[in-house]
């Protein structure tokens, strides 16, 4: 039996050469409908109309053409399944081996300034996506093409494999097909949302709307929160407090990412590697500390910068008990997130009725996606998260003097923090506590001045971390003048030698990590 290709396309580009190659070179029978069939017939190719194949005419003004068991049965039947083959034989259904479909031009239609609602609705394809998805599902036996850009790739592969479509190509085409239909449906959903709200999310993905927020970063901005119901922040339980805001969620994200540097556990089932607390303001950590206990870590984090902690967001990496809860009530805070809160802690914190308490289990974090997505004008930027493991054994000592054992611990602590600070980023730290943070300055030495000023006299004997290399030796010399004894940075500047020379002159130790951690 000759293989069968079903062709039904809105974009006729490359259609005739493809059909000619399939029929005349590879012996395919051509099955088609509507305008596609007419183009093929005019090119002198033998075509079986879908209506003749099914015995059912097109109805509802063309809304129903291919939605028929003789079409979908032929596409979905598994060739190696005896029961499927018996069904085909009993119903007199011929297998369909290739589906070439591109969809109604919905995006092009809605791009017209004078488009009406009814015109847009009529350009929502139904039968096309159904055939594409059916063929993609059964890619073990069926090849599916959704774009003229794929035709040459298909014909080249068929020529190289004696007329068959390689299984690897069928799988890749299936992947592209599912992405194609997902994008198509997203465009429809986005357009309908825009019609309903006058201004919708321009890159709405297939993520459920969790909540319409009070406003965005500022009161004049509208905002919505889309989230998987059980993953990431969608899996958090708000125990008390006011409704979450856009800024709350952004700060919570920053606080959680920072505190996870020290492990994240709950109820002792997956204990944190070291009790840690983080205070965040405007997505930058302003106080971070580890301690022998959760209350100790919290007190040290707040003491790092109590002025900036006012109105802040706090993340802790283990269960919050009553002692820590009492510390939390000592100042005004927006939100606290932790793996859990004891009943006694809940009772203490209930006195702060507006304080938002969020319980976020490690399981909700573990299943969160691996990508960082940001919107730009007309598109999206998608990158890997900057969460690779920190491995001090890979670092090198650039200075004549190596860091002492305590300096090594402090340098690792500071390096864990600096990648969570907006660039240009500088962190001053000592004994598992941040002492000063310089964030978001346009030059590195400016961030260093801010961090060192915040640390004050505590900078004596502390270390300094920089998220990028030192372009000049000015930061090293400034750090030494304030009592810093060791520095850490990625290295890679043409003038690394100047900074290393300054360290040697001033008695500082310098470690190079070889990895930059810019955060924009």
From Swiss-Prot:
UniProt keyword Transferase, yes or no: yes
A Pfam family of this chain: MGS
EC number: 2.1.2.3, 3.5.4.10
GO cellular component: cytosol
Gene3D superfamilies listed in its UniProt record: 3.40.140.20, Methylglyoxal synthase-like domain
Catalytic activity: (6R)-10-formyltetrahydrofolate + 5-amino-1-(5-phospho-beta-D-ribosyl)imidazole-4-carboxamide = 5-formamido-1-(5-phospho-D-ribosyl)imidazole-4-carboxamide + (6S)-5,6,7,8-tetrahydrofolate; IMP + H2O = 5-formamido-1-(5-phospho-D-ribosyl)imidazole-4-carboxamide
UniProt xrefs under HAMAP family: PurH
Family: Belongs to the PurH family.
Name of the protein: Bifunctional purine biosynthesis protein PurH
Gene label: purH
């Amino acid at each position: 039996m000759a293989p069968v290709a079903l062709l039904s396309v809105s974009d006729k580009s490359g259609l005739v050469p493809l059909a000619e190659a399939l029929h005349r070179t590879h012996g395919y029978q051509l099955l088609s409908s509507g305008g596609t069939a007419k183009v093929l017939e005019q090119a002198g190719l033998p075509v079986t109309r879908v209506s003749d194949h099914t015995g059912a005419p097109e109805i509802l003004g063309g809304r129903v053409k291919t939605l028929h068991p003789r079409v979908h049965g032929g596409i979905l039947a598994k060739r190696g399944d005896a029961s499927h083959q018996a069904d085909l034989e009993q119903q007199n259904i011929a297998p369909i081996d290739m589906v070439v479909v591109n969809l109604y031009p919905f995006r092009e239609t809605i791009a017209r300034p004078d488009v009406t609602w009814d015109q847009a609705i009529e350009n929502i394809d139904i039968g096309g996506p159904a055939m594409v998805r059916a063929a993609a599902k059964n890619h073990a036996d069926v090849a599916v093409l959704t774009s003229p850009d794929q035709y040459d790739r298909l014909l080249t592969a068929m020529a190289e494999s004696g007329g068959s479509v390689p299984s690897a190509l069928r799988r890749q085409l299936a992947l592209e097909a599912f992405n194609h239909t997902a994008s198509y449906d997203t465009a429809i959903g986005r357009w309908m949302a825009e019609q309903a709200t006058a201004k919708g999310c321009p890159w709405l993905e297939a993520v459920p709307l969790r909540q319409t927020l009070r406003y965005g970063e500022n009161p004049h901005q509208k905002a919505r929160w889309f989230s998987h119901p059980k993953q990431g922040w969608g899996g958090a339980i708000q125990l008390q407090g006011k409704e979450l805001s856009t800024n709350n969620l952004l700060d919570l994200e920053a606080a959680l990412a920072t505190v996870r540097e020290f492990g994240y556990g709950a109820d002792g089932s997956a204990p944190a590697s070291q009790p840690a607390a983080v205070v965040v303001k405007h997505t930058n950590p302003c106080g971070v500390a580890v301690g022998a206990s959760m209350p100790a870590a919290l007190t040290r984090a707040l003491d790092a910068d109590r002025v900036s902690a006012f109105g802040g967001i706090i993340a802790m990496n283990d269960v919050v008990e009553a002692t820590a809860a009492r510390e939390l009530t000592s100042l005004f805070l927006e939100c606290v997130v932790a793996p859990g809160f004891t009943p006694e802690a809940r009772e203490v914190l209930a006195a702060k009725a507006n304080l938002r308490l969020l319980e976020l289990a490690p399981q909700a974090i573990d299943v969160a996606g691996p990508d960082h997505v940001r919107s730009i004008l007309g598109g999206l930027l998608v990158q890997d998260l900057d969460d690779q493991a920190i491995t001090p054994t890979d670092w090198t000592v650039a200075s004549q003097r190596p860091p002492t054992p305590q300096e090594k611990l402090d340098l690792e602590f500071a390096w864990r923090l600096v990648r969570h600070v907006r660039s240009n980023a500088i962190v001053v730290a000592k004994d598992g506590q941040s002492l000063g943070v310089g964030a978001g300055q346009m030059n590195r030495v400016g961030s260093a001045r801010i961090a060192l000023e915040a640390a004050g006299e505590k900078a004596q004997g502390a270390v300094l971390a920089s998220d990028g290399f030192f372009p000049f030796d000015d930061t090293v010399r400034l750090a030494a003048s304030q009592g810093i004894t060791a520095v850490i940075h990625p290295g890679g500047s043409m003038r690394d030698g100047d900074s290393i020379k300054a360290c040697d002159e001033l008695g500082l130790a310098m470690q190079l990590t070889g990895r930059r951690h810019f955060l924009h």
